[in-house]
Amino acid sequence: MGACLAIFLARRGEEVVLFDAAHAPLTGASRWNEGKIHLGYLYANDQSLSTAAHLVTGGLAFAPLMEELTGRPLKKIAPGDDLYLIHARSVVPPDQAGAYFARVSQLVRERAGGARYLKDCADARAYALSAAELGAVAGEAIVAGFRVPERSLCTVTLADQLVDALAAESRIVHRMGTLVREVAAIDGDEGAWRVHGEAFDYVVNALWHGRLAVDATAGLAPPPGWSHRYRVSAFIRTTHDIVAPSAVVAVGPFGDFKAYDARTFYASWYSAGLLADSGDVAPPSPPTLSGVAKRDIAQRIASELGAHLPIVREVFAATESVAIEGGYVFAQGHGALDDPAATLHRRDRFGVRRKGRYISIDTGKYSTAPWLAHAVAQEIAR
């Protein structure tokens, strides 16, 4: 979010200072995630369709906005549609999931911009897998499957492109290795704000980790019911080509698998990768993982996810390199994903909050970042 907004503002003639506690931009969850460009299919336990309706606009706008930001075509886009594999312990039964997927497909068809998505989804449809199709890809605990027109891309590759785009903008000053703990209005909320002793016409808080604590210093109280989860996953490069589908084990605390191309993969299992879950305003520092701990996580992902999607075992067996990486994810929701009543099953409470010229952005999902950044840039640089 911060990188996207900085580039949009600089190209509108604004002088921008970009603060980051890390040594370089885009080193956390914005680099290390599955890269799903959401259309809303994942949130089948939100039968109101509110989450899908809030996500779909940003998802459809993602590709053209990102290509505008980087000046390059997007790379390493998963070549196949996502498979949603319904687990026997899913919090949403197969018939209900199928009906939900059909409603989301209709929503996508009704929105403008379907042809601009990672693939043309202007005529979006969800298809139930036959028994033979399901048996060819899934393990015994999977009771149904659906093919939906949702895609993912390799976020590591895109992060590198965004870093290059940031470096090319002369109006952006980089303050790396600088932790922002507080902000202060200088002469009322509608005037300048101070950060690290400097005055700025606008201050935008685009943090994932620590945003609420900084908001509090601005006098912006957090809405109730949030969570900070620190999650890691496996980012895999294989020694040779493997043809594999991208799939999500749904709906609950399971896992997913992305095939960006024939040698670049992502794999996760929720309980293996969830290393912290905090409802504090300031969550704990990210855990430091030893090499042994990372190997254990990789082995558990391979075992748990591989039991439901056997091709995963073949991918792990052919590993040339594997990185266990991730970051903090903020959600305006909480609870256990195996609880149908958990508010974490809804992700429609994200967006922009303001106090004068202090702006706080809850990005919501990776896929909605450029859309929100573009809107905020238009507001600031009119």
Identify the function of each model-found stretch:
Residues 142-216, 369-379:
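Helical element adjacent to the flavin cofactor pocket in flavoenzyme catalytic cores
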